[in-house]
């Protein structure tokens, strides 16, 4: 019989998530996976919502390797590396962005958040704008991964035509084909670089008035 501790339940939950997706993940299926009776799960998670709240933290612990700035790191480099690492973590599991969306920081995450905020403040951001910048990047990552994972799910539909094939003009046909060739990574990096460039202009304007 599987030793049922919280870590074992979460690990099995992540495996099941990859197999069936968020909508089809149930405590009944999880109990079957663990070869236990469903009530045994309630010692650790009272319901599916409680389980889903725990999965994002496990994803980030496992895959988000750049949540903290390195010594003497440029703030722009940190924001980009942090975002790329966060994106990798969400993409590593099916419906990763959907599960993460709407979650709030828990006590173990407060130390990381404070370190990030203090780092940006030392680089010329006021505390409020440091939080806004971090939130903007986080929301951009989650939103883009939501779109990407939804698109990946659509592509599994048989005989689904490419967008470029449906374009009404040759201009759009060529453009859409180029965008599809470039892929999601190029589009994501463009948006992220644009965000960070905007933060730099706002930061410079504030420093110029001090």
UniProtKB/Swiss-Prot annotation:
List, alphabetically, the PANTHER family matched: HTH-TYPE TRANSCRIPTIONAL REGULATOR RUTR, TRANSCRIPTIONAL REGULATORY PROTEIN
Instruction: Give the organism's phylogenetic lineage.
Output: Bacteria, Pseudomonadati, Pseudomonadota, Gammaproteobacteria, Vibrionales
Segments of the chain annotated as binding DNA: 26-45
What are the inducing conditions?
By the [Mg-tetracycline]+ complex.
Q: Where does tetracycline bind?
A: 64, 82
Q: What does this protein do?
A: TetR is the repressor of the tetracycline resistance element; its N-terminal region forms a helix-turn-helix structure and binds DNA. Binding of tetracycline to TetR reduces the repressor affinity for the tetracycline resistance gene (tetA) promoter operator sites.
Protein name, entry field: Tetracycline repressor protein class G
- In which residues is Mg(2+) bound? 100
Domain named HTH tetR-type: residues: 3-63
- Which keywords are on file for this protein? Antibiotic resistance, DNA-binding, Magnesium, Metal-binding, Plasmid, Repressor, Transcription, Transcription regulation
> Keyword Nuclease: yes or no?
no
Instruction: Output the Gene Ontology terms for molecular function.
Output: DNA-binding transcription factor activity; metal ion binding; transcription cis-regulatory region binding
In this record, what's one Pfam family?
TetR_N
GO aspect biological process, one term: negative regulation of DNA-templated transcription
């Amino acid at each position: 019989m599987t030793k049922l501790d919280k870590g074992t339940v979460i690990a099995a939950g992540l495996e099941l998530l990859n197999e069936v997706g968020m909508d089809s993940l149930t405590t009944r299926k999880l109990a079957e996976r663990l070869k236990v009776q469903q009530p045994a799960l309630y010692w650790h998670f009272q319901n599916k919502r409680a389980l889903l709240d725990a999965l994002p933290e496990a994803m980030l612990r496992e895959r988000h390797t750049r949540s903290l700035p390195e010594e003497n790191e440029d703030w722009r480099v940190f924001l980009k590396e942090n975002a790329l690492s966060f994106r990798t973590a969400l993409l590593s599991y099916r419906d990763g962005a959907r599960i993460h969306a709407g979650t709030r920081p828990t006590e173990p995450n407060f130390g990381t958040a404070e370190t990030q905020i203090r780092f940006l403040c030392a680089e010329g951001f006021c505390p409020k704008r440091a939080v806004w910048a971090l939130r903007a990047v986080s929301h951009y990552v989650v939103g883009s991964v939501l779109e990407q994972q939804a698109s990946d799910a659509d592509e599994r539909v048989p005989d689904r035509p490419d967008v470029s094939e449906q374009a009404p003009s040759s201009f759009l046909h060529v453009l859409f084909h180029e965008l599809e060739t470039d892929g999601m990574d190029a589009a994501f990096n463009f948006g992220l670089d644009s965000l960070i460039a905007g933060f730099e202009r706002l930061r410079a304007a504030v420093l110029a008035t001090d």
